[in-house]
A protein has these predicted regions:
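Short, charged hinge/linker segments at domain and secondary-structure junctions
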Residues: 95-109
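Classical N-terminal secretory signal peptides
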Residues: 1, 110-111
Length: 111
């Protein structure tokens, strides 16, 4: 079930509930919500859509684009790995597939 077409506020609340089911720590959930509202994520969301709020994104392809652009951002690799992990968790909430857990085909890894 894909949740991409529900209202942004419902996505935000649903994602928070999703996070709390994975880890019952409210500070953990709040930190993930904060990461999704960061300047970096807003800037990249604006690059791929007319929205600067990731919860307003209307296609899964745009979410994938945000994920990949965040992952490729090279100014602070460690920080962008954290952000891309949060975006991956959000994508899992939206459509059930977490990008960080996807297994690459053997031929893809070898170039």
């Amino acid at each position: 079930m894909c949740l991409i077409n529900i209202e942004p506020d419902k996505k935000r609340k649903g994602f928070r509930e999703f996070l709390l089911r994975r880890n019952p720590s409210k500070s953990f959930a709040d930190k993930y919500i904060l990461y999704l509202s960061s300047r970096l994520v807003k800037r990249i969301a604006r690059q791929v859509s007319e929205h600067d709020d990731i919860y307003s994104i209307s296609t899964v392809k745009q979410l994938y684009d945000i994920y990949h652009l965040t992952k490729c951002e090279s100014t602070n690799i460690r920080l962008h790995n954290i952000y891309s992990g949060v975006i991956s968790a959000y994508i899992k909430y939206i459509n059930g597939t977490e990008l960080r857990k996807m297994v690459m085909h053997k031929d893809d890894r070898n170039g």
